[in-house]
Amino acid sequence: MIALLQRVSEAAVRVDGETVGAIGPGILALIGVQRGDTEAQAARLLERILGYRLFEDEAGRMNLSLSDTGGGLLLVPQFTLAADTRKGMRASFTPAAEPGLGRALFDHLVSLACSVHTPVATGCFGAHMAVSLVNDGPVTFWLEVPPPR
């Protein structure tokens, strides 16, 4: 399971012109689900998202996590993160989870997040979304919890 984390001043996602999720300062996390991922990967990825230190402390060092700051978390499904781009000029989506598994694990991740953090907002799985953000820094990190072998 993959998360592309972006520290934001604000972020929002719209579907058909309607805002379905928005946060102030916090993390926009684009989420990709890979074949073979399980609920264990989702739980570990959430632990890393909430605990990853990408906010500055009083000394200006990135020593604070989202759990420390209480900022917003916007989770947006993005299956293209699981693409294989090593060859040619077109991505292969073979590594991406089938839509049913992808939706189930994204929903599980959201449920876990809502049970331990607030505020949490989300995009819509399978929808064409317009995502807007103000990247703070910019600070962007790629986190991955590989599927079991």
UniProtKB/Swiss-Prot annotation:
It comes from the Bacteria. A Gly-cisPro motif from one monomer fits into the active site of the other monomer to allow specific chiral rejection of L-amino acids. A motif (Gly-cisPro motif, important for rejection of L-amino acids) lies at residues 137-138. One of its GO terms (biological process) is D-amino acid catabolic process. The keyword Transferase does not apply. Its EC number is 3.1.1.96. Its main location: cytoplasm. An aminoacyl-tRNA editing enzyme that deacylates mischarged D-aminoacyl-tRNAs. Also deacylates mischarged glycyl-tRNA(Ala), protecting cells against glycine mischarging by AlaRS. Acts via tRNA-based rather than protein-based catalysis; rejects L-amino acids rather than detecting D-amino acids in the active site. By recycling D-aminoacyl-tRNA to D-amino acids and free tRNA molecules, this enzyme counteracts the toxicity associated with the formation of D-aminoacyl-tRNA entities in vivo and helps enforce protein L-homochirality. Keywords: Cytoplasm, Hydrolase, RNA-binding, tRNA-binding. HAMAP family: Deacylase_Dtd. One of its GO terms (cellular component) is cytoplasm. It is an enzyme of class 3 (hydrolase). One of its GO terms (molecular function) is Gly-tRNA(Ala) deacylase activity. This is D-aminoacyl-tRNA deacylase. It comes from Thioalkalivibrio sulfidiphilus (strain HL-EbGR7). Homodimer. Pfam families: Tyr_Deacylase.
